[in-house]
């Protein structure tokens, strides 16, 4: 199934079907604004083109056997951007998911939302919740959209919930462990990311899944998100397959 992922132009080898494909891939979608600026276009055009890449990469990841694809689409820090840009970005998931719902269903994709969703505009939350509900029975790849998400706030939120249980007398402070924190994160039902991909040449996490990526493999590329191709995705998977994950061992 995976041997169709060949870059016939430059001879790139296919993903190795005999080597582990990452179960959970997380991507920081970066470079939409720069993509548009390089072409003398408004930033919103870049964001719209970036949505097309989401369709392409979700389809590729699904066919490769990736189980969870988490996309960092809007962070808790992105609210400081111009209001017109924020409004446009938060309309995109609504338009994308509504138009793509038949394809998502046909490809057995399950959509999930991660983040402080109650702070999102009602129209955004309603649209994503609807698609999540209608795809809940699908058992193909999970498309996990991080909207209004921040890694630090995720940890703080989990810590507060654990503290509430201590106050209620459910357990003592000395009983708190990593598993308890993990059980109260937005990702409590998901495996930690095996591979993080970040586009646009930036070399930082930008407050994304800080707890969950303790042992994730990182892969950075200068390619801007709207230009990110299936071949680029294959390259990231190939690099991952060649690495040895030690988890602190030797």
Mark where each language-model region is.
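Flexible, compositionally biased loop and terminal segments
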Residues: 1-250
């Amino acid at each position: 199934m995976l041997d169709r992922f060949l870059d016939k132009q430059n001879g790139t080898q296919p993903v190795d079907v005999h080597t582990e494909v990452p179960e959970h891939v997380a991507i920081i979608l970066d470079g939409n604004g720069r993509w548009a600026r390089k072409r003398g276009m408004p930033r919103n055009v870049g964001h719209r083109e970036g949505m097309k890449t989401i369709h392409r990469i979700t389809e590729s990841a699904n066919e490769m056997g990736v189980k969870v694809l988490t996309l960092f689409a809007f962070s808790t820090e992105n609210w400081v951007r111009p209001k017109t840009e924020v409004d446009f970005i938060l309309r995109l998931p609504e338009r994308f998911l509504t138009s793509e719902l038949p394809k998502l269903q046909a490809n057995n994709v399950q959509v999930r939302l991660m983040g402080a969703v109650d702070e999102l505009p009602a129209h955004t939350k309603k649209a994503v919740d609807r698609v999540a509900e209608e795809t809940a029975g699908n058992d193909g790849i999970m498309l996990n959209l991080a909207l209004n998400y921040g890694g630090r706030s995720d940890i703080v939120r989990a810590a507060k919930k654990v503290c509430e249980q201590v106050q209620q007398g459910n357990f003592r402070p000395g009983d708190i462990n990593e598993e308890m924190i993990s059980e109260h994160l937005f990702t409590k039902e998901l495996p930690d990311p095996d591979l993080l991909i970040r586009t646009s040449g930036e070399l930082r996490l930008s407050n994304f899944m800080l707890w969950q990526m303790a042992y994730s493999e990182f892969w950075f590329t200068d390619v801007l998100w709207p230009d990110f191709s299936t071949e680029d995705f294959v390259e990231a998977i190939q690099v991952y397959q060649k690495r040895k994950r030690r988890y602190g061992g030797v």
